[in-house]
């Protein structure tokens, strides 16, 4: 592996100042999704490090070293996940959203639940037109929240492999 540890806990302030030794950085909103990521020994994603559990603590994405990396963001498919995606993309404009699209929501809509409170209006100009349309769709749904930890691992692995292969 790239690091001598399978897992480690790092402060956001450290991520701001210390470049991670990987070409690809995967940002995952929720650390409960660790079980869905490919195991390094079975299905490695070369030169990839996942940072899990930052939630709304996204200020570290202003780190200059991230501009030189291939970066993806995977969050809940709800207004809060899209809100965090917008904030993240405000720091890293070239960031790629994974599994945060209408096709993913439609394919797994049976797993969706009601979102008790919608996120505030988001950072203007950071969503793609399709993401903006998705946000409107999710707000209009009775069950407009698809939490990432309930997506099938196969769907996650497929999306990650496609992202890695683009690079």
Per-region residue spans from a language model:
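Catalytic palm subdomain of template-directed nucleic-acid polymerases
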Residues: 76
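Nucleic-acid enzyme cleavage-core boundary/entry regions
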Residues: 1-69, 80, 86-97, 103-167
């Amino acid at each position: 592996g790239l690091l001598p540890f399978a897992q480690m806990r790092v402060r956001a302030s450290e991520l701001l100042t210390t470049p991670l030794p990987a070409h690809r950085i995967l940002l995952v909103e929720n650390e409960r999704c660790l079980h869905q990521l490919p195991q390094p020994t079975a299905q490695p994603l070369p030169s990839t490090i996942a940072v899990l559990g930052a939630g709304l603590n996204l200020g570290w994405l202003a780190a200059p070293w991230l501009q030189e990396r291939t970066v993806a963001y995977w969050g809940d498919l709800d207004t809060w996940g899209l809100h965090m995606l917008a904030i993240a993309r405000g720091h890293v404009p070239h960031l790629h959203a994974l599994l945060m699209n209408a096709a993913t929501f439609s394919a797994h809509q049976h797993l969706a639940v009601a979102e008790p409170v919608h996120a505030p209006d988001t950072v203007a100009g950071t969503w793609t037109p399709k993401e903006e349309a998705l946000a409107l769709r999710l707000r209009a749904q009775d069950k407009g929240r698809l939490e990432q930890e309930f997506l099938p691992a196969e769907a996650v692995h497929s999306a990650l492999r496609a992202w890695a292969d683009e690079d």
